[in-house]
A protein has these predicted regions:
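An acidic, low-aromatic, low-complexity terminal/linker signal
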Residues: 1-151
Length: 151
């Protein structure tokens, strides 16, 4: 398993590399009226409209500065960019190196984290991006899919 490690609000988080389509420099976005507060806006880097999500806002932290990177994923044929501060590198943990969650995580992260990777004297929280996208854009899933994902 390969994990893209990135920094957000001074903490280290991860996303499976197989979910990442590309990483691009931050670009200004156009706000979307009446959208989820985590939706930073939309932008169009190559004639494709992409929804930008500010992970800091989603995790109840301060808004990410208008700099950094977009980690672009494709979820159910919807391009989604996650605004992060910086990419730190690729981790290659073994399955047994990903610890299950316990009470050390805050409530906001515990329900959307797949586990914690310990390496180089720091912890990287492996986020569940399927759950994050489903919570922000619930209309992408059927009722049954949403219930199964949130269990």
């Amino acid at each position: 398993m390969e994990i893209l490690e990135f920094k957000l609000g001074g903490n280290s988080f991860g996303i499976p590399v197989d979910m990442v389509r590309e990483i691009i420099p931050y670009q200004a976005t156009t706000p979307v009226p009446n959208s989820n507060p985590s939706v930073e806006g939309i932008f169009m880097p190559r004639d494709v409209i992409i929804t930008a999500i500010d992970l800091s806002v989603y995790l109840n932290r301060d808004k990410t500065a208008e700099e950094g990177l977009f980690v672009i994923t494709n979820y159910r044929n919807l391009d989604v960019a996650f605004h992060v501060e910086e990419a730190l590198g690729i981790l290659r943990p073994e399955e047994n190196e990903i610890a299950s969650l316990d009470n050390t995580l805050g409530v906001d992260e515990a329900h959307i984290a797949k586990g914690v990777i310990r390496h180089d004297d720091r912890l990287t929280i492996l986020l569940d991006f399927d759950k994050i996208i489903a919570q922000i854009q619930p209309d992408l899933l059927s009722k049954e899919e949403m219930e199964a994902l949130l269990q």
